Swiss-Prot record:
This is PTS system maltose-specific EIICB component. It is a multi-pass membrane protein. The keyword Cell membrane applies. It comes from Bacillus subtilis (strain 168). The phosphoenolpyruvate-dependent sugar phosphotransferase system (sugar PTS), a major carbohydrate active transport system, catalyzes the phosphorylation of incoming sugar substrates concomitantly with their translocation across the cell membrane. This system is involved in maltose transport. Maltose uptake in B.subtilis occurs only via the malP-encoded specific PTS-dependent EIICB(Mal) and not via another transport mechanism. GO terms for biological process: phosphoenolpyruvate-dependent sugar phosphotransferase system. It catalyses: D-maltose(out) + N(pros)-phospho-L-histidyl-[protein] = alpha-maltose 6'-phosphate(in) + L-histidyl-[protein]. GO terms for molecular function: kinase activity; protein-N(PI)-phosphohistidine-sugar phosphotransferase activity; protein-phosphocysteine-sugar phosphotransferase activity. The active site is at residue 471. The gene is malP. Residues 1-418 form the PTS EIIC type-1 domain.
């Protein structure tokens, strides 16, 4: 059950990967339309402003079509076969569901307490999805419907029908079944969701009122649950869902950047919900402190090697906000250190929130700069000065706390391991190429294919693998016999940052190239 929950959580990350670039475009466009910074150039009737307005509207694509992206994205990770067809089925069924909801509320809206004559948005509980006026179920509805379609797809896509009904096989069969299932679901949603919307409104008020305590708990859970893969369920309702802001913090913040840039009111007063998106500060300020502590406490003869390991993963965490490569270098060595990391991350976010820092800062430096500092520094500069000062203070706190704990408890962090060589059955890439009669001067693609093959071998071979999926940085694999899987040292030798083991379920921490690695692994498995 835990494995299924983890896979479901990782599936939500597929569309999330699209938000980074879109956020940068919106942030830069807002900056170049800001009258305070650009002066006469920011005249709405001028060519400069109009050009950036056009560019900005393109950047809004993923924010304005979030439910559609989640409906299409879920099958990419969860469909076990014919993922492209599963995406088409999910989109078709999701639109069908919304047409049913729209029709039901148009005919019987009074019975369900919904007035379809209202304008969409605001407190109406209504929205437009692909031109359909329907209940605003946000990404929750999209994920729910898409998950049903994926279940039906995995179960019935290959079902053989009589020859005279052959035209209804495959995707058509899934859509047919789903069509009739959507009718009672649409009825149920039309009855239940207005009550849920009322509850969400109360939840938003409660979480905002919880203030610093709520921010601490949220940030702590977002960090501490990373090893389980369940952290997706913590941040997604806040960042992309309606837990504290209509449309999610990402969308709401981007929509109001222009307004905030023109206001002299404190940011915390303008958008108190922004305290629930400060968890990226631990990536920008906390990780450097951890990395420095690892380097300082490493053995003298291993410092150069440790620096080579830490510099790229630290920069990845700071700039892109991807922390798993460095966090997994010490998570399994010392879970206690990871718990300390979660406590410090939560405390940093809370202190910043109490100092008036809010915004969309769940990622790395790119997100902080383009969606916060650049567009808003002109009118809220001191807020970000406080943020940087607090952040650098916590960099020092991280360093001294981690250094003390590593030395006090003699923790075998990178560069402090015992010099023991583990024997492995896995042959090297060179030996593999020789066995395959391949030229040593292989292309990058061929080398990547070799690595994929070696990962398969490390996981017990093709016959031992039953399922392969991925999230942002992890290759998630189910195997028949976990005893055939090689030790972690083998995976690290291949370039992995670590391995999470949970019975027959394995998560190989590869990094941002994991989607390409999954494709290569699947290609080899299907040969």
């Amino acid at each position: 059950m835990m494995q299924k929950i983890q896979r479901f959580g990782s599936a939500m990350f597929v569309p999330v990967l699209l938000f980074a670039f879109a956020g940068i475009i919106v942030g830069i466009s807002t900056l170049f339309k800001n009258k305070t910074l650009m002066g006469p150039l920011a005249d709405p009737d001028g060519f400069w402003y109009q050009c950036w307005y056009i560019i900005e509207q393109g950047g809004w694509t993923v924010f304005n079509q979030m439910p559609l992206l989640f409906a299409i994205g879920i099958p990419v990770a969860l469909a076990k076969k014919a993922q492209a067809r599963a995406c088409l089925e999910a989109l078709t069924v999701y639109l069908t569901f919304n047409y049913f909801v729209s029709a039901i509320l148009t005919v019987w809206g009074g019975a369900f307490g919904v007035d379809m004559n209202q304008e969409v948005g605001g407190t109406s509980g209504l929205t437009m999805i692909a031109g359909i006026k329907t209940l605003d179920t946000n990404i929750i509805g999209a994920i729910f419907i898409s998950s049903i379609v994926v279940f039906l797809h995995n179960r019935y896509f290959d079902k053989k029908l009589p020859d005279f009904l052959g035209i209804f096989q495959g995707s058509t069969y899934i859509v047919m079944i789903s069509f009739f299932i959507m009718i009672p679901i649409a009825l149920a949603v039309s009855y239940i969701w207005p009550m849920v919307q009322s509850g969400i409104g109360s939840l938003q008020s409660f979480l905002v009122a919880s203030g610093a305590v709520g921010v601490w708990i949220y940030t702590f859970l977002e960090r501490i649950l990373i090893p389980t893969g369940l952290h997706h369920f913590i941040y997604t309702p806040f960042i992309y869902g309606p837990a504290v802001a209509e449309g999610g913090i990402v969308t709401y913040w981007a929509q109001h950047l222009g307004e905030y840039s023109q206001s002299a009111k404190p940011l915390k007063e303008l958008f108190p919900q922004g305290g629930f998106a400060l968890h990226g500060n631990s990536k920008i300020f906390g990780i450097p402190g951890i990395a420095l502590a690892f380097y300082v406490t490493a053995k003298k003869e291993k410092k150069k090697l440790v620096a080579g390991l830490l510099i790229p993963v630290t920069l990845t965490a700071i700039v892109a906000g991807i922390t798993e490569p460095i966090e997994f270098t010490f998570l399994f060595i010392s879970p206690f250190l990871f718990a300390v990391h979660a406590v410090l991350a939560a405390t940093m976010s809370t202190v910043m929130y109490m100092a008036g820092v809010v915004g969309n800062m769940g990622g790395g430096l790119i997100e902080a700069v383009t969606l916060n500092w650049i567009p808003l520094f002109g009118s809220h500069g001191m807020t970000y000065v406080y943020q940087i000062l607090i952040g650098l203070s916590f960099t020092a706190i991280y360093f001294f706390v981690f250094r003390f704990l590593i030395l006090k408890f003699n923790i075998a962090t990178p560069g402090r391991e015992k010099d023991e060589q583990q024997e492995t059955k896995l042959y090297s890439k060179k030996e593999y190429r020789e066995r395959k009669n391949k030229d040593e001067t292989a292309s990058a693609a061929e080398t990547a294919d070799d690595t994929a093959f070696l990962y398969i071998e490390a996981l017990g071979g093709k016959d031992n693998i039953t399922e392969v999926t991925n999230c942002a940085t992890r290759l998630r694999v189910s195997v028949k016999d976990e005893t055939k899987v090689e030790p972690d040292s083998v995976f690290r030798a291949l370039g992995a940052h670590g391995v999470v083991r949970n019975g027959k379920a394995f998560q190989v921490i590869i990094g941002l190239s994991v989607p390409q690695m999954r494709e290569r692994v699947e290609k080899i498995l299907n040969q």
